[in-house]
Amino acid sequence: SDPLGFKDLLASKLGNVYSAVQDFPMQNTMFQPVGGMDQIAKAFEKRVGKNIRYHSEVQTLRQNADGVTVTFKDTLSGKVSSVSADYCLCAIPLSVLRNIDTDFSDKFKQAVKAVAYAPVGKIGLQMKRRFWEEDDHIYGGHVLTDIKGINTISLPSTGWQKKKGVLLGYYHYQNTAIEISALSPAERAEFALDAGQKIFPAYRSSFESAFSVAWHRVQYNLGGWAEWNDKNRATAYPVLIEGEGRVLLAGEHLSYLTGWQAGAIESAWQQIAKIHERASA
């Protein structure tokens, strides 16, 4: 066949595909935990579950020369309790931490407030049959589209040839995420189905159920991930990465791999080393 003309290549927005692999994280070989990404969190729960307090909303964080005290409320009973320790490694997103009553210095509080968080939304669509495999012989991968609000439809990379399947119906950010999140869950599903129907003829007829999330509207997230700019990396990041007193912060927001579990884990290792160093001094 004849090669496409340069004008046609530009019109196809092929550059958007290449731009997705320019960032360092996208250039590396990636693996998925068997059973889904939440298996990493479940593995932590399996190892340290006895130390986890569920339904516990942090109310205050106070420290002195000897230790740190965190006050929290049981969201089921309303009971307020507290726990104290020599050090605190706080993994609460900055978007949430800034609204908690702390005794951080003004400089530290300003650094916490300086970091913006990305509005992000996704929807999972369960299909009663895997039409993309049965009809189109597509196994895994992504469908990149210029349909506003959709961005990417991702097909499952596991469970091939099984009866049902869950695909990612949209993955959007910023203003588009804010607009779509204003819809009800049912309206979000309708929006995703209307768009997907333009690509796959069996999209709507195969639909069974949906689950959507807008992370900027989730109470304990208030955003998909931290969005650093050059200014804040130079001013706020050095303040936050050092922590204050006996409180250190950790999470994807305290790494250069924001939005990734890998960034959160690397951040934790780094901060644990600091606690060990300070406690051993």
Language-model regions, residue ranges each:
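A short acidic, glycine-rich active-site loop
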Residues: M30-F31, K109-A114
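Short hydrophobic core segments
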Residues: V58, S82-S95
